């Protein structure tokens, strides 16, 4: 048995309707996310124990520490595993709309307004062909906030 398991959904598959239908959520959870979980575990089994013992975020943040012949599989499947986990945990029923609090302040400071952020996010991620992810990312070292896109499909926003 591998280290990672398919996380339980924090809400029902139909909770995001009408924006995302229940069947799409179920397929992404039980098929896609499960496949990333299984393939990540299979790739990690072939790595040294010190890699296997790390958290996926630590592995993805230091992907060069992974044996070269395993990097691509771990980067791809670890990214797919964690991107889905982030997605499930950042969506909620009756969510959406303009944020408040510190995230709203940070968006305003970095992009001018929430409307400007949405425009930047949309224009940056619209060029992703096929599968891919777009993220609002924050670098605590430089305090930079930016919209990141990952065109290499499900790889990680952590590197």
Task: Name every feature range the model reports, one short phrase each.
Residues 148-159:
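Positively charged, low-complexity/disordered segments
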